[in-house]
Structure formats: C-alpha cells, structure tokens
Amino acid sequence: MGGDDAPEVPVRAALSALTDGPEDLSILLVGDPDRLEPAVRDAGQPPERLRIVPAPQTIAMNEPPVQAVRRKPESSIVVGLRLQREGEADAFVSAGSTGAVLAASLFVLGRLPGVDRPTVGALFPTADRPVLVLDAGANVGCRPAHLHQFAHLGNIYVRDLWGVEVPRVGLLNVGEEEEKGDDLAVATHELLREDPELRFVGNVEGHRIIEGRCDVLVCDGFLGNVLLKFYESMAGFIVGLLRREQAQAGGRSREPGPVERMLDYTEYGGAPLLGVDGVVVLCHGSSPPRAIRNALSVAVDSVRADMVSDLGRDLEALSNRTRRGEM
C-alpha cells in the first residue's frame, strides 16, 4: 500500500478494477489492516474478490532501499512479492518506493535465467503508438550486453502486450550513423545489428523519438531517466499551456482533448519491471486512481499473455547463443 496518498488512492483503484475489470480478477490489498479497512469501507461496498493481507511494516520513500528491504521483511512491498513467489498472487503492482520494489523483486523473485540486470521501462507517446524506453533509471553504468538484453526484454513485452508481431528496436544515440556515439553506443549498435532475432532499425536521435520510428528504444539508465524526467516536465508544461489557453478563450469544457490525453501518463498505467521471475508493475508515488487502475490492467494483460515465460525462454536462448560465440 505505497504511494503519496495511500491507502485511499490504491483502494479506490482496486475497487474500480474489480467493478469494471474481468470477472475472474481478484485483488489482495497488502498493508496495515487498521488503515486499509476504513479506506475500503469509505470507498464503497467491498466486493468478495477483495482481500486484505496484513503487512505491519512500511518502507518510506527516503529510506535506503536495500537496507530497508532487509530490515523490514513484513513491509507491504516484501509481503506482496512473497505472495507472488508462493503462488498466492500472479502479479504485483505498487506505487511505493521504486528502489525498494527493485531491491525486493531481486531478493524475493530473483532474476530470470540469462538476465544480468532487470530493467524498468517507461512509455513515451509518439505520433503512432507509444514507444517503450529501456532502461528508465534502474541501471546506470551499463555494458553493451546489458543493453542487448534490454532490447530482447522490450521486444517480447511489446509483442506479447501490444500485439506487434515484429517490434522495431532502436538505439538512442547522438546521430543516426552507426559509428556515432561513445564506445557503449558503438558496441551496442553492432550487437543489435548482428542479432537475427531483432528487427533493429538503427540509431534514433532524441528529436526523432516522437515520430514513432521504433517500438522499443534502448539506452543506459542514466540517459533514460534524464529523458523520462524531461518528458514528464515538458508534458506537464504543455498541458498547463493548453488549459490556460482554453480558459482565456472562455472554454468551459473540462474534458481533456486528444493532445492532453496523449501526454497524460495516467493513460499508460505503470512501468514494467522486466527480467525478474514475476510480473511487477511500478507506479508513480503521486499516481491518481486512474493510473493505478490502468497499471492493474497492464498486470492482468501480462499474466494472461504468459509474458514471464516468454521472457525467460528468449533470454535463456540469447545467453546460450552468447556462450557458444554466436553473438
């Protein structure tokens, strides 16, 4: 039960998902029952498919993630992931501390075979459909092999969840020519270009992202997080301008227009954590109910698509090819 407005916002999101979502969906709310039970009562009649699982400890946003996870085995993050590992849950969604979720996912679920570093994705709107950017901040100081794995993880995610049969994979770089960029970019470009399992479309410059040139865009987590934070601030700036312009023109409609909807991160739900042995979806700490509700949909779709099994098979095959010297 993490997030800036927990437990009220996650509870409202859960009830909305159970009301409007698939009939076979059930949700476990993990946290302090003394706080969760009143929030559930205040939000409306709780359905039978909602259950509260006690977790008396809480990890604050400013706590060192690894130490907090080790010191607090009964925190909602650790308990929730343990439920998935033990088969009582199929997925885990959290608006709590991103670092704590990452650390706990590694401790509790572990990595998939062949995965060196799990990666966090971020969805960016484009002129066509969203692009999945990997890594968005979980991994700083990557090697070419890490970015190669990110490309495979993103490739399977986009194929399974978006129905794109052969996703286009791009490499974020300072120029389109294959010799452009630092040593990491040049070496990664060669790996992606020579991989017959990927539809590599080459280097993608920052100003080309919104053109929809690729479905998966790989980069180091430092660069990806800077890109993410800039996009979030610019999207908020543009939405603010649109609303101010509407108000000055005497507009009264509060319905968001197509541009505002496209820039609204709540449209896309949460960010997937790919490469761990389970379904984990991360939400903004400030997420409103709608964003968490959409993140729950992402989790459901991931489970139905058996995405984790597909990721495991693909990354294990990549690891075997690498060991045989085929990459």
Task: For the regions a language model picked out, list residue spans one by one.
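Short, glycine-rich nucleotide/cofactor-binding loops
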Residues: 1-8, 138-148, 282-289
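Glycine-rich phosphate/diphosphate-binding loop of Rossmann-like nucleotide-binding domains
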Residues: 8-9, 21-28, 33-37, 43, ...
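Solvent-exposed alpha-helices and their adjacent loops that cap or buttress functional pockets
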Residues: 19-22, 44-46, 69-73, 83-87, ...
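Short beta-strand segments
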Residues: 29-31, 51-53, 94-96, 123-125, ...
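Phosphate/nucleotide-donor binding subsite
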Residues: 45-89
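Short, conserved active-site loop motifs that form the nucleotide-linked donor/cofactor pocket
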Residues: 49-50, 131, 198
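Glycine-rich phosphate/nucleotide-binding loop
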Residues: 106-133, 211-217, 221-327
